[in-house]
Swiss-Prot record:
This is Protein FAM107B. Residues 1-79, 99-131 are annotated as: Disordered. Residues 61-108 form a coiled coil. It comes from Bos taurus (Bovine). InterPro entries: FAM107 (IPR009533). The keyword Acetylation applies.
Length: 131
């Protein structure tokens, strides 16, 4: 291979080319990642080689952890939120009781209806006997 002619010259005025620095190779994070991938490849733990069942199990575990965190966040409600929930429940109970009372007033019990029917039939029988 032919060497460039500026190597032979000892001319101080010439700017000698330097090899460019690869920012990816100098990055510490990238080096660590590359090293970890190589180690995993040697051990046979490459991410693309995982069986489908193992991937599904890992996804389920992640989902379960996320769900548990959400539940814990809901359990850690402030005093204000707890008090508001109590008031809301009380209001709902009062509303249900009012609805029940209205239904009872609008729809009398069955025995009251039967008693009214008996009176009417008794009166009708008495009227037919008189006539």
């Amino acid at each position: 291979m032919a060497e460039p002619d500026y190597i032979d010259d000892d001319n101080p005025e010439l700017i000698r080319p330097q090899k460019l620095v690869n920012p990816v190779k100098t990055s510490r994070n990238h080096q660590d990642l590359h090293r970890e991938l190589l180690m995993n490849q040697k051990r046979g733990l490459a991410p693309q080689n995982k069986p489908e069942l193992q991937k599904v199990m890992e996804k389920r575990k992640r989902d379960q952890v996320i769900k548990q965190k959400e539940e814990e966040a809901q359990k850690k409600k402030s005093d204000l939120e707890i008090e508001l929930l109590k008031r809301q429940q009380k209001l709902e109970q009062l509303e249900l009781e009012k609805q029940k009372l209205q239904e009872e007033q609008e729809n009398p019990p069955e025995f009251v209806k039967v008693k009214g029917n008996l009176r009417r039939t008794g009166q009708e029988v008495a009227q037919t006997q008189e006539s």
